[in-house]
Design a protein with these regions (language model features):
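Mid-length scaffold segments of soluble, non-membrane domains
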Residues: 56, 60-78, 92-103
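Short amphipathic alpha-helix with an adjacent loop that forms part of the alpha/beta core around
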Residues: 47-51, 84-95
Length: 147
């Protein structure tokens, strides 16, 4: 009796490991604990504030959170409304501006994704052809702490 139960348990474990192993192999280049943003693309609240009028703030949070509160002067540009909001953003942006994208917290990936799309799809660069899109370290939570 015990041998049959152990055998069934081992079969169930093996069956559960097959899809997990397949997913690990398929997504091996997308390790979840690896940061999606390089250190050179992250900016602290203090650094972004020091840019003054040369910084353009982009809120990547859902519209409801933006409407409730946001960084003064920030514009909404998120994944949910990307196609509708991108033209508004591009109308306000110029190559002499540094773009600071933020979302709710450090663990939120929305800012990283919006920043990536601005770099790759909208091909934003500064006047010298360098990166001008940054992700705010700590996101909205960090901004609120340092108000």
């Amino acid at each position: 009796m015990k041998a049959g139960a152990i055998r069934q348990a081992l079969i169930l474990i093996a069956l559960a490991l097959v899809p997990a192993l397949g997913q690990a192999i398929y997504f091996r280049n997308q390790v979840s604990w690896r940061s999606r943003v390089s250190a050179s693309e992250i900016v602290s609240v203090d650094q972004a504030r020091s840019w003054g009028d040369n910084a353009m703030w982009v809120d990547a949070r859902p519209a409801e959170e933006f409407e409730h509160d946001h960084i003064p002067g920030a514009i909404l540009l998120n994944e949910d409304s990307w196609n509708e909001l991108l033209s508004q953003f591009l109308g306000q942006w110029s190559p002499d501006k540094r773009v600071v994208v933020y979302c709710s917290a450090q663990s939120c990936n929305a800012a990283a994704e919006v920043a990536r799309r601005l770099r790759e799809e909208a091909q934003l660069k500064d006047n010298e052809g360098k990166n001008c899109v940054f992700v705010l370290e700590g996101g909205w939570e960090e901004w609120v702490k340092t108000r």
